[in-house]
């Protein structure tokens, strides 16, 4: 399946407080991992998956990211930028703000996630699911982070990032797909988080689930940063094709 026409919204506008002092003067996307800015590793991975278009949703120190990565040509990518503006919009608000650049359907990933799975398979599952949104999940069993999803193999029954319980053996993998009309009733240019939006989608039976088998990596914490640095020094991100 060709993914060249599938845009990716990459949410990288947060303050990254858990990584301070590393992020006091630079955004999380520019934190060095295996001797390169983390965003460079993300772009190489996306390129290897056949993706060519990325919309960076930026807030805190976003101008530094644009200055370093420009139009993305050095990575074989077409990068566009969507800035929050005077106030940070949160993950949901930033996505709503970027909709004019995203088209009818698009991937969403987070600016601190490294997700080595098969994106074409995820896209095909979305096209077959008949719903306007799809969350990929991983059977985490509270190993690498707190599991926050109850999933029966076909449907996402519950999502709760704030108050997870033992019935939740899966975790939001961090790779999701939306149709743009999913956000039709969301406030424009007002802050909100995707974590607040998912339970409403579940209630309205609009959120499909798809299980991936590859574990996730993240740099949202010092531990995650060290773990990914170790991985990438031994197994670098895929080369650009």
Question: What annotation goes with each model-predicted range?
Answer:
Residues 29, 78-80, 132, 206-208:
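Conserved beta-strand segments of alpha/beta enzyme cores
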Residues 15, 112-113:
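Active-site metal-binding loops of divalent metal-dependent hydrolases
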Residues 129-139:
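A short, conserved acidic/glycine-rich loop-to-beta-strand motif
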Residues 2-10, 18, 36-110, 121, ...:
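Conserved N-terminal catalytic core of the sugar/cofactor nucleotidyltransferase
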């Amino acid at each position: 399946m060709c993914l060249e026409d599938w845009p990716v919204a990459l949410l990288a506008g947060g303050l990254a407080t858990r990584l301070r002092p590393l992020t006091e003067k630079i955004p999380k996307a520019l934190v060095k991992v295996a001797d390169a800015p983390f965003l460079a590793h993300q772009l190489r991975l996306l390129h290897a998956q056949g993706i060519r278009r990325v919309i960076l949703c930026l807030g805190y120190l976003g101008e530094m990211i644009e200055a370093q990565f420009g139009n993305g040509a050095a990575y074989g990518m077409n990068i566009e930028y969507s800035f929050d503006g005077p106030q940070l919009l949160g993950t949901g608000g930033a996505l709503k703000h970027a909709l004019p650049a995203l088209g009818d359907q698009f991937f969403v990933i987070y600016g601190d996630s490294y997700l080595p799975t098969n994106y074409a398979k995820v896209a095909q599952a979305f096209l077959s699911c008949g719903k306007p949104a799809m969350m990929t999940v991983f059977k985490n069993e509270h190993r690498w982070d707190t599991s926050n999803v109850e999933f029966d193999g076909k449907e996402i029954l519950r999502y709760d990032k704030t108050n997870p319980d033992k019935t939740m053996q899966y975790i939001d993998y961090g790779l999701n797909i939306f149709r743009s009309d999913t956000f039709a009733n969301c406030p424009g240019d007002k802050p909100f988080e995707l974590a607040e939006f998912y339970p409403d989608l579940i209630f309205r039976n609009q959120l499909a689930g798809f299980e991936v088998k590859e574990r996730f990596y993240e740099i949202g914490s010092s531990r995650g940063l060290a773990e990914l640095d170790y991985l990438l020094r031994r197994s670098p991100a895929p080369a650009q094709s």
